[in-house]
Amino acid sequence: MDRELIEICKENSATAFSVGYQIVYLIYVVLSVTSIFTCSYFIKTFIWNSTFHPNFKLLLTMYFFAAIFHSFLFTASYLMMIERFLDYQTDCDIHVSMVPYAIVHSSIACCLFCGMLTQVFMVIERLLATIKIESYEHNTSFWHILAYLFFCIVLPLSLLVWAYQDADYNSPVITAISPPKGVEIRLNILYIFCFFLAILALILLQVVRFVNKRRESRIEISLSGRFQIVENIDTTTFISSILIINMIMSVIYIVGTFTLRNFQFDAFINNQPALATVKTIFYLHPLFSFLMPLISSYHLSKMRERRVKRREHLMAIKTKGREGSDAYNQLLHDQWTQHFLK
């Protein structure tokens, strides 16, 4: 065994047994386990029982399933580390085996990029719903579903094959979330590409929301079109919150890891455990998976409340006699006024 590998083994062993590193990792594991249940509950309660368009339901389900699988795999990566503790005799025994490492790490990367691209296609789907406002409610087919599955699963897999073509899974690592040697440059390109794609998606989402808000008071739109407009406004607000939070955490991760990789800090000189602990803190995906169903539940609950209030308001309007006539005339007056103000 060469001297360089011995030094790596000592550093990695010291990191794995570091109290700070274990506390951070364990906190993220708790968040991951919790998010498995909260995301599953959200899918069952808020997605499958919703009145959303089938295409949007599919993309939203895929997005939350990607978060569930990531949380499951992140927990598995910690269990792999615990397994190495049980067999620990020398410093190099702390490194995870190649095959489990390759399987878990590749799957984690796939979940992350599937989630990133799925949120972009949720924006594209809302754009199509805005363009085909009168017919989109009844516009779904097997080919649409197949296309979304292709772009949200096959495309991320193809990008990962490109990024990991020179991956060395024999790299000595203590956790499956650490990328292998040979992928840093291409992986950074993918992260930056997905980040700027998310910025463009957020800008497009605001344009879609603005267009739907402008259409909301137009009197010539059919009942089906009005329903689609209201759904577009509600869902774009909901997606915006997810995109913004994801972008904030992506910025923290990208800037944090770039800074640690390219600049030296006195606190981390000859202190590999502290450096590894801070890098793990910047890996905010478990925190995002934990917050996402909570924030999404809040937005969709508010959406339901608004729909109930609109329905109660309509039911409270008088429909007979002089009061009914006055109420109807007032509704027409309000609609015409809003229409010509546009």
From Swiss-Prot:
Keywords: Cell membrane, Cell projection, G-protein coupled receptor, Membrane, Receptor, Transducer, Transmembrane, Transmembrane helix. GO terms for molecular function: G protein-coupled receptor activity. It is a multi-pass membrane protein. The chain crosses the membrane at residues 23-43, 62-82, 103-123, 142-162, 188-208, 238-258, 275-295. Residues 1-22, 83-102, 163-187, 259-274 are extracellular. Pfam families: 7TM_GPCR_Srab. One of its GO terms (biological process) is sensory perception of chemical stimulus. InterPro entries: 7TM_GPCR_serpentine_rcpt_Sra (IPR000344), 7TM_GPCR_serpentine_rcpt_Srab (IPR019408), 7TM_GPCR_serpentine_rcpt_Srb (IPR002184). GO terms for cellular component: dendrite; perikaryon; plasma membrane. Residues 44-61, 124-141, 209-237, 296-342 are cytoplasmic. It is found in: Cell membrane; Perikaryon; Cell projection, Dendrite. Expressed throughout the nervous system, in pharyngeal muscle, hermaphrodite vulval muscles and in the male tail. Not expressed in male somatic gonads or sperm. G-protein coupled receptor. Plays a role in the navigational capacity of sperm and promotes the targeting of sperm derived from males to the fertilization site in the uterus of hermaphrodites. Belongs to the nematode receptor-like protein srb family. This is Serpentine receptor class beta-16. It comes from Caenorhabditis elegans.
